[in-house]
Amino acid sequence: MTKDLYIALHIAAKEGQEEVAGILIEHNAEMSAATKKGFTPLHLAAKYGNMKVAKLLIAKDAPVDAEGKNGVTPLHVAVHYDNQNVAMLLLDKNASPHACAKNGYTPLHISAKKNQLDIAKTLLDYGAKVDAESKAGFSPLHLAGQEGHMEIASLLIKQGAAVNAKAKNGLTPIHLCAQENKVEVAELLVDNGADCDAETKAGYTPLHVASHFGQMAMVRFLLEHGVRVDVQNELGYSPLHQVGGHIDFQYCGINIVLALLNIVLNIGETFVMKLNTQYLNVG
C-alpha cells in the first residue's frame, strides 16, 4: 500500500493492466478499497478511461455507485474526464444518473459545465433529471449559461429545463450569462421565455450584474430587450450605481454609463434626481 492508500489493484486499474487486475482479484484483492480521496479501483478505471479494467471490475461485482470523500461516484469521474464509453458502461450496469456529490452536482451538472454534449444526451436518455439542483440551487442550465455552452443549453431547454430556475440566492441562468458576458446563450434563454428583469433575493437584476462586471455586450443586449433601468436592489442601488465596481472603468465603464443614461434620460427626471441626491449624500 502506498502513502496515498493505493493498493496494487488501484495501480492496475489506473494503468489499464487488465490481466494483472484479474490475477489480483482472483487472489482476493479488495475491490472496495479506497485511496485517501476515497477512490476505488473502479473510480480510477473511470478516470483514465480504461474500459477493459472497468468491465472486469464490474463483472466481479465492484460497487458501481461507490462514493469518494467528496461524494463523487465512478460515473461522476467518467463524465468529468469525458470518458463516454466508461460512462455508458456504468449506466448500462445500473449506475445512478441521479447520484449527487457533496456539492449537489449530478453527472449532468458536470457535463453541462464541461460542454460534453454526447454524454449529456446519454445521461438524459438514462433518465437524468434536467432540473436537478446543486446544494446552492444551481441547475445544469445555470452552469451551461455561465460557461456559454450553447449546444448544451439548447439540449437542456428542449428537454424541458426551466429557463427561469432560481438558485437559493435567486440567481437565474440569465444572471450568470450577464456575469460572464454570454450573450448567445442569453438570446437563447430569452427566446424561450427567460425573464430579463428577474431579481435575486437581494434585488439584483441581470442588468445590475452586467453593469457591475463591465459586460458591455450584455448591457446592450438587455437594454435592447427593454429591461428596467430604474430598478433598485435592497441597498437602493440601481444598475448605474454598479458600474465601476470591479472593472477597468476607462475601458468600458464610460460606455455603460452612457448607454444607461441614454435610457434613463428618456424615463423622466424623477429617477435622475434620485440618482443625483444619492451621489451627493456623502456625509
For each predicted feature, which ranges?
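Low-complexity, intrinsically disordered or signal/transmembrane-proximal segments
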Residues: 250-251, 278-279
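Ankyrin repeat A-helix N-terminal signature
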Residues: 11-17, 44-50, 77-83, 110-116, ...
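Ankyrin repeat domain, specifically the short helix-to-loop turn at the C-terminus of the second helix
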Residues: 22-29, 56-62, 88-95, 121-128, ...
